Regions:
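Conserved ASCE/P-loop NTPase catalytic core
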Residues: 4-221, 260
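Trafficking entry modules
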Residues: 299-300
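Basic, amphipathic alpha-helical bundle interface domains used for macromolecular binding and assembly
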Residues: 24, 160, 180, 187-296
Length: 300
């Protein structure tokens, strides 16, 4: 399905009965999951920010945490089955992911092969070489030794991970996740809705998937502008930060602010707009603030 930006925007606006379709569209993403629209929006933000820029990282790392059987793996499976993500289990081998310089062919180098792609990693707390993820999550590249020489490989992956026990995940890795979502056991009402879904299934699943894929593909190709046109524009975009810092009576690191800006850029793409405004920055701060409550470590 090939659709123009205007066609996609028109259809989505009709679906949402207004311009604010970003609050409605997540319901159609990963329909196998009942509820969790906040998680769906976060994963969609991850999908639309494919590449970093000369200014730094644009890719958004997502962590899904909670006890087994709460729905985390459904997102992982959806990304693998519908979005072509590289699926990794907790026991993935470093030699397969980054390569093996001792081999003449350098090994598999899955991270390099999935440069620009999606990686869905289940049970990351069981990954023995988890610290090797740090440079990839932050910089989108890594260095490996080949024949006694060091070579740099591009690995700008969109990373979505799931963990049952984050106490086993090193803090430097946890601090690289832009958005963290906790999954509780379903409530009585949620369990009833899940039972309804499992019995009735999803209507028009193939058409819905095609529509969402066309939407995400269109959003990915938008390059939103963050820099303001004048001093008034600068003040307007800084105001959400100033209001937030004053409300909590503390400042935040540059890394935290950069995370807000890349989330805001993703939200702008999902709105099919070409300029980040104070509205998207404020929404990104709300998403990030809720996420920060899931981890007791600073994003710095």
């Amino acid at each position: 399905m090939t659709m123009s930006l205007d066609e996609v925007r028109e259809i989505l606006t009709e679906m949402a009965e207004g311009d604010d379709f970003i609050q409605v569209v997540p319901e159609f993403f990963c329909p196998e999951v009942v509820g969790h629209n906040d998680v769906k929006l976060g994963v969609m933000c991850c999908l639309v920010n494919q590449w970093d820029t000369p200014d730094g990282r644009d890719r958004i790392n997502i962590l899904l945490k909670g006890q087994p059987g709460c729905g985390k793996t459904i997102f992982i499976d959806h990304l693998r089955d519908r979005w072509g993500a590289l699926y990794l289990s907790g026991d993935a081998k470093k030699s397969s992911l980054k390569g093996d310089g001792r081999r003449s062919d350098g090994g598999i180098r899955l991270f390099a092969k999935y440069n620009g792609g999606i990686v869905a990693h289940d049970e990351i707390e069981e990954f023995s070489d988890i610290n090797t993820l740090r440079d990839i999550m932050e910089n989108g590249r890594y260095v490996d030794a080949i024949g006694g020489k060091y070579e740099e490989f591009e690995a700008q992956i969109r990373y979505v991970a799931a963990a049952n026990d984050i106490s086993k995940v090193p803090k430097p890795i946890l601090s690289r996740f832009d958005l963290v979502y906790h999954f509780d056991m379903p409530s009585v009402e949620d369990s009833i809705r899940i039972a309804q879904y499992l019995i009735a299934g999803v209507k028009n699943l193939e058409t819905t998937d095609e529509m969402i894929y066309a939407y995400i593909s269109t959003a990915m190709n938008i390059d939103p502008v963050i820099r303001p046109r004048d001093i008034d524009g600068l003040d307007a975009k800084v105001k959400p930060f100033a209001d937030h810092f004053e409300s909590i009576n503390e400042g935040k690191s540059g890394r935290w602010i950069k995370s807000i800006l890349r989330i805001a850029k993703a939200l702008t793409r999902l709105k099919l707009k070409d300029e980040v405004t104070a509205v998207e920055i404020e929404e990104a701060i709300e998403m990030k603030t809720a996420s920060d409550k899931q981890l007791e470590i600073p994003f710095d």
